[in-house]
Amino acid sequence: MIRLLTGVALLAMPAAAMGQEAVDDSDTAVVLQMTAPIPAEEIVVTGAGSLRPSGGDSVQTTAVLRDLQPGFGTRIENRLRDEAGIVQFRRSDGRSAHPTSQGVTLRGLGGNASSRALVTLDGVPQADPFGGWVPWSAYDAINLGGIVIARGGGSGADGPGALAGTIGLYSTMTDGVTASAAYGSRDSWDASASVGGNLGNGQVAVDGRYSRGDGFVPVASGQRGAVDRAAPYEQGGLGLRLRFDAGDDSRIEASLRGFSDRRDRGTDFTTSKTDGVDASLRVVHDPAGAAQWLALAYVEVRDFDSGFASVAAGRNSVAPALFQRVPATGLGARFELRPAISGDNPLRIGTDWRRTTGRTEEDFFFSGVTPGRHRIAGGSSDTVGAFAEWSAGDAGDGLLWTLSGRVDHWWLGEGYRLERNIGGSTITNLRFAARQGWEGSGRAGVRWTSDALSLRAAAYRGWRLPTLNELYRPFRVGAEVTTANEMLEPERLWGGEVGVDWASDGTKLSATLFANHLSNAIANVTLAPNLNQRQNLDAIDSKGIEVSAEQRIGPATLRATYAFTDAKVDASGMASTLDGRRPAQIAKHGGSVSLRSNDDGPFGGFATLRYIGKQNEDDRGLLVLGDALTLDAGLSWRLNKAVSIEARGENLFDELVPAAISASGVVERATPRTLWVGARASF
């Protein structure tokens, strides 16, 4: 905490100075930029393919990130770290982290790499259909108009995956041409382009991005051996969006995008490859003062390959341990209706369906580079739900309340796990009976607003179905083996929060107290040395406070966020050794301070200071990841209306950010200091 407060002071002093300088010469002052949240009623996202915000959006705790220009090493997952309380399973980003570790959650509901927060792109769920991790690199190629972060569970419209909250990505359609190119440390390149314009009675836009780099050595200095080397990456994506007016305030939108992600973990036999193709089609009827509706259908196809290595003591030799391929498919559809009852259509009703299928195909028990055994495991899941939400009152002044409910029926198809010696006998041939059940979720919220002050409160219930990965796939990391558990039950959340907001004359303050009880929480439980199993814990209890403050200072805005999270495991039986411990990968303290310019002068920039506290690497708290304070900053100079040049830096302190630690004490680090320089153009 002392390190964070010191960093706040460092940013605040130049901010105050800039506020003085701006009075004399605001057109030429070099100022810093920040990303600020905006109230739900101000959100306007072009081409998002969704209905206008409802009254219920104003009751939920919401933050919005804007200024999401791609390129120059900008990563969506790192921008999310600007908001305290958003927790990603690993501190490393999509250039070096293993793809299966990139889950996301909120409010201390962690300890598991599967996402407990729902991530959507224009309303389409984005978590991997098999594993629940999020392919963050896929969104760097998309021209995003904003990210809406809704905290807390129980949202009927978002679906059952929104256990801890929803992170909604919203794309926008380019009108003209924009492009950027940058060169960075370790021979890194990052290029992006977007082209869009009118097509008949509609619009068309094409977005693309390519990035690559030689990478850095993941193992911390002083612990490296002969097998350790830099971990290169190569990533790219291409997207096509079409939008046509269908008359009578209706439009049809189609989206097709694909991405490719190649990474390495810094030793031989650890290359991973992820390829994906997504398509969606929607029809939106959104007149003001009349009935509104939306129909959406989508498909997601993923193909993931990864190698895993076994490194000998002393790190002087390495051998293949496992090769894995995971093909998976997600299908879904949604329909929402807002009848014309009165005012701004206070009633929302709808239904949705989601299906996931996938399997893991693995080769292991290597002799040299030849595998001796093959395993295939997988299954399918379906969820069908219906929801309703009613909002009443005045979002701008007085009392506003909302009540939502949802009921879901879920199915787990027959699962399977087959293991055999390659070219020989069958070792395991298991079939797991199909299961099904019903779950309910809901949310009640109220907000009272008077002039600059708002008070709010909410209570909610949500749930999450185990992923196919958690149910059927055992895995190994080094000497650590984790077995699957086909009998896992759905996770269920009860929670509540109270908060206060104040806004006046360029100043915004917000504070939220929350408490959550997650029963049946799925975690990796240690059974014996080097042997774990996924199990339902009795519960994870998490309570804490989230605070944000924002101040306009001349042509700049200063924003700070802080989250205190007190999370503990409630466990018995085989997991009793975890009782009272903090969940793995959850820090008690986290915060950020950002400063960004917000005018149209020729000079601009940003500075973001992030702090993350100590956290446990493992379920028993035997391995601890130290805290870290990092600084990102950048400056831009607009040469004319079309062209600007920029320089950016990541982790300018070159802080050691521990991302993982093995049982033998070997520390994996996140991104070290990285510098970028390049140009942007728009026509």
Please state what every model-predicted region is.
Residues 301-305, 357-366, 409-426, 434, ...:
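Surface-exposed extracellular loop regions of Gram-negative outer-membrane beta-barrel proteins
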Residues 39-74, 98-103, 117:
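N-terminal periplasmic "start-of-domain" segments of outer-membrane beta-barrel proteins
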Residues 124-151:
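Short acidic/polar hinge/loop motifs at secondary-structure boundaries
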